[in-house]
Amino acid sequence: MSKLGNRADWADDEEFDDPSALPPQQITTNKDGTKTIVSYRFNDEGKKVKVTRRIKTTVVREHVNPQVAERRSWAKFGLEKGNAPGPSFDTTSVGENIVFRPSVNWKLQAAEAEKNGGEKGSVKDQLKDKKVKCRICSGEHFTARCPFKDTMAPVDEPTAGGEAGDEDSPAAGALGAGTSSYVPPHLRKGAAGGGERMAGKYEKDDLATLRVTNVSELAEEGELRDLFERFGRVTRVFLARDRETQRAKGFAFISFADRSDAARACEKMDGFGYRHLILRVEFAKRAT
């Protein structure tokens, strides 16, 4: 019994592994001067993860102005009073330090550039704020790329009837005009007017396109399609957007497959409240 009494309990030498405990951090100094740090943590799934980092310490000596070094040692005041020296990440944004090194003859180069390109620079300054504007739908794209160039007339374009002059006067260069000089057909009177148009695939859209104004900036093409498809099949929806903000510019074009559906939609949707604004709906100008 005495032997058994002097014998240590086997449970005293047994180490119990606590699943919630993490091993201590291990720091090893390598021969090349770097340090290897091994640590443990739990991931989002609750599993133990081993993290190994290798750190190299570099000492950088900087020569600064004595007055700058003195200002850095000042005690902070105001909302930063009591904080440690140096910039705080929550209140200070540290940008890249850009060193300006002018060339030896930078004054001469600047004078030559101002002398040679003065006029060009002024033209650039005049055109830098200019934006591309479509003559058909007033959108920020070229007129040749307008999706409604075949179905709408340009804004504020006079009609062909308004340009007609004296119909009784003979055309310049025609036979019997009283002159022997020949004038090519494209320079004769009336040549500037457009010829007869053949009915194309956009001829039907030309008659069934609605112009919707006073549209909210937060509008979407899908929402407009859902609003107008209640009156008939919609073939095309164009919502003008700002190129920089991608927000609606306040107007849109809705094309229907049938003009009767477009007329019914124009009657019902004109004055309709959409996103706290009253829509203005009318038929788009027909292309001449």
Swiss-Prot record:
Annotated signal peptide: none
Any single biological process term in GO: translational termination
Subcellular locations according to the entry: Cytoplasm
Pfam family, one: eIF3g
This protein's record includes keyword Protein biosynthesis: yes
Keywords: Cytoplasm, Initiation factor, Protein biosynthesis, RNA-binding
Location of region: Disordered: 1-33, 156-197
Listed PANTHER family: EUKARYOTIC TRANSLATION INITIATION FACTOR 3 SUBUNIT G
Annotated family: Belongs to the eIF-3 subunit G family.
SUBUNIT field: Component of the eukaryotic translation initiation factor 3 (eIF-3) complex.
Function, as annotated: RNA-binding component of the eukaryotic translation initiation factor 3 (eIF-3) complex, which is involved in protein synthesis of a specialized repertoire of mRNAs and, together with other initiation factors, stimulates binding of mRNA and methionyl-tRNAi to the 40S ribosome. The eIF-3 complex specifically targets and initiates translation of a subset of mRNAs involved in cell proliferation. This subunit can bind 18S rRNA.
Name of the protein described by the UniProt record: Eukaryotic translation initiation factor 3 subunit G
Organism lineage: Eukaryota, Fungi, Dikarya, Ascomycota, Pezizomycotina
Gene from which this protein is expressed: tif35
